[in-house]
Amino acid sequence: MSLPVEAVIDFLKSEQARGKTHVYLDDDAREGLRELFIRARQQVAKPEEISQETANHSASASAPTPEIPAVVELKIEGADKAAKLESIRQQADNWQPAKALDSLRENMVFATGSPDAKLMLIGDAPGHNEEKEAEPFVGPAGQKLNDILKAMGVSREEVYISNLVKFRPSMPRQTTNNRKPSPEEMAACLPLVMAEISIVQPTLIIALGGTVAEGLLGLDGKISEMREKWHDLSGIPVRVTYHPSYLLQSGGSNQVKRSLWEDMLAAMEKLDLPISEKQKSFFLPKS
């Protein structure tokens, strides 16, 4: 049985007050935090309801679940999509639920692209290049993503590209090396990307990598078991596929390229984009 998540949070707060930034958590404690993370994902499915939740918070007579500051504090303001996204960007810049973890770096990296995009692509977290340029997917993996979009017949400016975590995860003696975000880091930043989704209202979302699938959809397992199907996020279809960096790590494997491309073909079909015979045959074995 999992430990009461309130006890885990109290322990983490006490350790933080003592100046500790890293602690060991056993499986029960981790499971408690995972349950909290899943509840947070469910609670922020519709960011426009956040203000109402805040108003009702003090009037609730039932025993509340552990309070998630990100859910309570986030406000969406503005007359149009661009203005609303700007309001989220400003709040993200000093997002206390993320900064309080003391495990993320200081520079915030927000999204890029069109507020009216039909296609939204979400990565896990910014890396060294993204932190330096303050824009998601600008390094080698970003170039791969640009190539994929070009092959689809769309430009980077037509889509909306974001990351689940808005700050680069930190490491001891860190230079250009990166690490994937933890469940706690994803939970802290989840309200931000959920607000972006609510504002942009894309026709579909591409989740780039297993970490995003875990943080955004609560999935766990191998990418091969998650892809080739549509998942649902607040009524928006989501396709899970390989992160562009995996193309680099796989040594240019045509099998990996074809698998990713098949997910993109499925997205193109759902978006009613034209698909040529040449596009259909990309990365197929030559007869």
Predicted feature descriptions by range:
Residues 5-46:
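N-terminal intrinsically disordered, low-complexity tails
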Residues 21, 37-287:
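A polyanion-binding, active-site-adjacent surface
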